[in-house]
Amino acid sequence: MVNHGNMYGPSFTFLGIPQCDLDIPASFAGADVVIVGAPIDSGTSHRSGAKFGPQAIRGGDYLPHDGSRPHLALRTDGLKDLKVVDAGDLMMPGGDLVASLAVLREATEKISRSGAIPVILGGDHSIASADVAGIANHLGRGKVSMIHFDAHADTGEDQFGALVGHGTPMRRLIEDGYVRGDRFLQLGLRGYWPDHVTLAWMRDQGMRSYEMTEIHHRGLTAVLDESFATLTDGCDGVFLSVDIDVVDPGMAPGTGTPEPGGMTSRELLEAVRRICLELPVVGIDVVEVAPPFDSADITAILANRVVLEALSAIAKRRNGSTYSPTQNILDR
């Protein structure tokens, strides 16, 4: 029998961390973070392939999959300093998007109620309507604020006549009362959608959307400073949703709806680090990685690093130690 090992086996976990089974609560009892894959792209409007995203993200690394990743800047190990387990991919029937999202909603609620932070690997962005809802079912509707990185607002009233799709989840979350519109922030929007009617709806909900031109001229640091004050007002936790197409397609080509003029990979990683260091994050999803359109796995590697950045920063926040981005790393 051939032993492929943790890195190349037919079923491998995120960088070799322990497995768990959501049907066996004891297998993730006491976990700080549970990673779960949502391999579905039935909600896409253009290029499919995001259903292959979860495993691409899990394997997006050139180092041994040994369940350890010391962070050079933060001096923490997000996979060791936290108890992180991987539940594998959910069974999500591609022909029934509504049923698949119900499976995800139940799974994220179960993880949240266990006391762990769900980290969901997508999959297309339709999954946000389910994973955020699952956490809100536990913590309370309107008690979870949201920070959403994306080239697109995803606030469509419908998607080619369908209420569920990767262009509508943020509208569904607000209309269904899971997230308050005035505690919903978006960063990285650009391009040629949505239309003025949808923008008016977003304004009426109290949403705050930072288009890339504003971010460029004001600076990402100033935008994040302004965002953080809003996110923690009247809410018990923050959900971080990262659509990889927020990054310029020159740095993240492997996605379904690429839009030029986006963030750099460094900007995204620094933003994720700050969010997870400074805010009470209760859930994360990383979506729209479409390996068939990737080049040399650079999009999958970036998505992998988004997850690692978040876990490392959460570990740093929990251990209470200080961090200065301008300090010499040898003196930390």
Task: Give the label of every model feature segment.
Residues V2-R332:
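Conserved alpha-helical scaffold segments that buttress catalytic/binding sites
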